[in-house]
């Protein structure tokens, strides 16, 4: 049997899938620790590695494989179901098996996505400060037509200070915070003026290396729900620009409260793909 994680109906991705839109012909890049391409619930069609000695289609950490499943786990009667199971999935490895990496590797990954005509990129990663090269890379990606999605960060509210990380904090990037199954903000979810939308990020069940599955918490888990939602919109309306897709997601989100803590609210991809 196939498990449908709670996040799929919570963002109404099930409704869009039922219309026949599942992300076909949309190229999504997971900029992360790589993807365990041997997993039977994932189909990786390409990628690149910017971590020396590691190939893109392996994942010694697990993070990237989990993120990938939330976007794209196959609709195949087994395992779990992703938000957009028919996307063309690309593994862009910029973080090592410990989950750490350099801004230069991340920049190279973003540039690879831009050069290879990807439609959506997910960055479930971040740091407390940015870099000129990182800003230029995400700005260029967005200008080239890529929907750029990133985890807002797991630094909490820290006495209501702005805790949004980079690259999420940049204008060209959709910063995604985390809610639980009851639509309450996760205590760890970063806050700030740049926070754009919320998605499920508590006890998210997805693919994991060695052909297994596990539940994880984090804005890292919320971000791929939004990347997948963008892919669903693009599979229904292939001619939309990145800014149009972004606007649909934010303008149709369900308000959950103060924008400093919730952005525009929980994404509703059924409404966004009207």
Curated annotation (Swiss-Prot):
The keyword Secreted is annotated on this UniProt entry: yes
Subcellular location: Secreted
Pfam families to which the protein is assigned, alphabetical: Peptidase_S8
Keywords attached to this entry: Calcium, Hydrolase, Metal-binding, Protease, Secreted, Serine protease, Sporulation
Reactions this protein catalyses: Hydrolysis of proteins with broad specificity for peptide bonds, and a preference for a large uncharged residue in P1. Hydrolyzes peptide amides
Positions that bind Ca(2+) 1: 2, 41, 74, 76, 80
Binding locations of Ca(2+) 2: 168, 170, 173
Cofactor annotation remark: Binds 2 calcium ions per subunit.
CC terms in the record's Gene Ontology section: extracellular region
EC code(s) of this entry: 3.4.21.62
InterPro entries xrefs: Peptidase_S8/S53_dom, Peptidase_S8/S53_dom_sf, Peptidase_S8_Asp-AS, Peptidase_S8_His-AS, Peptidase_S8_Ser-AS, Peptidase_S8_subtilisin-like, Peptidase_S8_subtilisin-rel, Subtilisin_Carlsberg-like
Note: Secretion of subtilisin is associated with onset of sporulation, and many mutations which block sporulation at early stages affect expression levels of subtilisin. However, subtilisin is not necessary for normal sporulation.
Protein name per the record: Subtilisin DY
């Amino acid at each position: 049997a196939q498990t449908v994680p709670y996040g799929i109906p919570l963002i109404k991705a099930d409704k869009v899938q039922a219309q026949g839109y599942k992300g076909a012909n949309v190229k999504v890049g997971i900029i992360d620790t790589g993807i365990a391409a041997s997993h039977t619930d994932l189909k990786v069609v390409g990628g690149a590695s910017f971590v020396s000695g590691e190939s893109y289609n392996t994942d010694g950490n697990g993070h990237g494989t989990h993120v990938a499943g939330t976007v794209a786990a196959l609709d195949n009667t087994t395992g779990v179901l992703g938000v957009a199971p028919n996307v063309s999935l690309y593994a862009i490895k910029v973080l090592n098996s410990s989950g750490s990496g350099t801004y230069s590797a991340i920049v190279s990954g973003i540039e690879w996505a831009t050069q290879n005509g990807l439609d959506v990129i997910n960055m479930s990663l971040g740091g407390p400060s940015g870099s000129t090269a990182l800003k230029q890379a995400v700005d260029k990606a967005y200008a080239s037509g890529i929907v750029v999605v990133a985890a807002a960060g797991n630094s909490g509210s820290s006495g209501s200070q702005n805790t949004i990380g980079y690259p999420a904090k940049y204008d060209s990037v959709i910063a995604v915070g985390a809610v639980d199954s009851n639509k309450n903000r996760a205590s760890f979810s970063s806050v700030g003026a740049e926070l754009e939308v919320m998605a499920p990020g508590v006890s998210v069940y997805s693919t994991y290396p060695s052909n297994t599955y596990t539940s994880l918490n984090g804005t890292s888990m919320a971000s791929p729900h939004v990347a997948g939602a963008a892919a669903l919109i693009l599979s229904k309306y292939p001619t939309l620009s990145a800014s149009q897709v972004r606007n649909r997601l934010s303008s149709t989100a369900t308000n959950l409260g103060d924008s400093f803590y919730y952005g525009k609210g929980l994404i509703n991809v059924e409404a966004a793909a009207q």
